[in-house]
Amino acid sequence: MAHSRVPTNWGEDHLLKRLPDARGHASNIRAPGGWIARFDKDGKNWETFAMGFRNTYDMAFNVDGELFAYDSDMEWDAGTPWYRPTRFYHVTSGADFGWRTGTGKWPQWYPDCLPGAYGIGPGSPVGVVAG
């Protein structure tokens, strides 16, 4: 991608050892995790719109053109301090929702990490409709 609306504050400088998920989930995925891009009508000029998602099954726009997404939890993290429930996000330009592999998820108090609009709890989201 030629451009990112999200600050690219991660690096592969090897100053700190990488700590992938001990169970091996997404061990080949590097920060910032899942992302949403936007591009022109010809499918060119891609740019990162938002990132830091774990596994967004579905998203939809409301009548005002605002984007909403439903992101799933990591079921085997349930009961741990870093567990994140299934969440509904209001996706804004330049947002980073902080999902990282393993225990490296950004806490919601990080200034660069947007919280979910609503926490649903354990589950697997499908079928978002907005209007």
Give the positions of each predicted feature:
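Beta-propeller domains with acidic blade repeats across secreted/periplasmic ectodomains
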Residues: 1-131
